[in-house]
């Protein structure tokens, strides 16, 4: 640097002075406190665009319209944590926890910690205590359900701008909760979109204000896509013919290696969530591990006519399915593929 010789302190001295300052704690850029791991969704399309899932010690926001798959996706993160022997916490502000459905989604509800707070303040304490105790993941369901205690202090509860209170409370909660992520847990908030009024063009917003987006390290937007119908009932408007819907997921923000602004489609069925075999087959097609020509599908030395045929084959041959899963994960996480699988 110019004129460095004329300065009283050398670069090394300045470096050591800053690191040893007891008033403000500083570390080197390679300190282990910055290291993190990820919690996989174990839904290959989502793991692909996030490069392995959501980061621990960070804040993730899942938002979108009603019945668009947000809570189901969050439940799969909890399922992954439980399978790894960790602790998952669900803060049920909407009072919508359904043990039967969560069990059907793969959760061990006997090992789930569930809070039912009535106010934002109670929710804050539940989340803070969970993170400080070392919980692996804490789900807030949802931001739209946050009710500041001040709402209850007014007899009428009307005319006191509760929306502004909610936004202020949520942003203050995040200011105080983000530092608690140093304990190693992942904080995940679910939020819902709302239509704005008074604009020429309808625009979406969400409870809690725009400030919450700046706190996020990972932000995903969910919408409900096309209906999945029974075989031969394509295009039917009869509800009895609908088996599920497509979850459209877009990664809007990711500070840890995700494919930002990428959108994926996940087929979701009412009776059992996601058919993982079919899902991996579809992702393997995208990765070039399985080849399709017209109605024919080719994998290694085998060929199949139609999607149902190849999916059924993998369901009946667990060894081949495990190899497909390993090859697919390797491809979308590292960009490498096994040549023998193509």
Region locations from a protein language model:
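Terminal-proximal interaction/regulatory segments of ATP-powered molecular machines
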Residues: 295-342
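Conserved inter-motif catalytic segment of the P-loop NTP-binding fold
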Residues: 3-4, 65, 76, 84-172, ...
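The Walker A/P-loop phosphate-binding site
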Residues: 5-112, 128-129
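N-terminal cationic and glycine-rich segments that engage phosphates or anionic surfaces
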Residues: 151, 195-199, 293-298, 307-309
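Long, well-ordered amphipathic alpha-helical subdomains in the mid-to-C-terminal portions
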Residues: 276-305
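Residue-level signature of catalytic and energy-coupling elements of molecular machines
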Residues: 46, 102, 141, 191, ...
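Catalytic phosphate/metal-binding cores of nucleic-acid and nucleotide-processing enzymes, i.e., regions
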Residues: 2-6, 45, 60-62, 83, ...
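Phosphate-binding/switch region of NTP-binding enzymes
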Residues: 163-287
């Amino acid at each position: 640097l110019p004129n460095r010789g004329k300065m009283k302190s050398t670069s090394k001295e300045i470096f050591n002075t800053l690191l040893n300052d007891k008033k403000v704690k500083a570390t080197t850029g390679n300190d282990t406190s910055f290291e993190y791991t990820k919690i996989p969704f174990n839904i290959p399309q989502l793991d692909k665009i996030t490069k392995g899932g959501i980061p621990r010690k960070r804040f993730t926001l899942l938002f979108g319209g009603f019945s668009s798959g947000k809570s189901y996706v969050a439940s799969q993160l909890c399922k992954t944590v439980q399978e790894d022997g960790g602790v998952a916490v669900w803060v049920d502000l909407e009072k919508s926890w359904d043990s039967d459905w969560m069990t059907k989604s793969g959760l061990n509800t006997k090992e789930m910690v569930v809070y039912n707070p009535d106010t934002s303040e109670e929710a804050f304490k539940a989340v803070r205590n969970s993170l400080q105790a070392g919980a692996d993941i804490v789900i807030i369901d949802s931001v739209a359900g946050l009710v500041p205690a001040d709402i209850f202090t007014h007899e009428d509860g009307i005319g006191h701008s509760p929306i502004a209170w909610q936004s202020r409370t949520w942003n203050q909660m995040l200011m105080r909760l983000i530092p608690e992520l140093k304990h190693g847990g992942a904080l995940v908030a679910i939020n819902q979109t709302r239509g704005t009024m008074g604009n020429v063009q309808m625009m979406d917003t969400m409870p809690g204000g725009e400030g919450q987006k700046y706190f996020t390290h990972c932000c995903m937007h969910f919408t409900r896509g096309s209906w999945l119908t029974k075989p031969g009932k394509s295009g039917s408007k009869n509800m009895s013919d609908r088996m599920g819907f497509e979850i459209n997921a877009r990664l809007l923000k990711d500070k840890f290696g995700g494919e930002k602004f990428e959108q994926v489609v996940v087929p979701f069925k009412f009776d059992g969530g996601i058919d993982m075999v079919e899902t991996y087959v579809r992702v393997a097609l995208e990765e070039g591990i399985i080849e399709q020509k017209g109605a024919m599908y080719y994998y290694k030395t085998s060929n199949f006519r139609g999607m149902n045929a190849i999916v059924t084959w993998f369901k009946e041959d667990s060894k081949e399915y495990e190899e497909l899963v390993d090859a697919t994960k390797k491809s979308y996480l590292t960009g490498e593929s096994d040549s023998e699988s193509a």
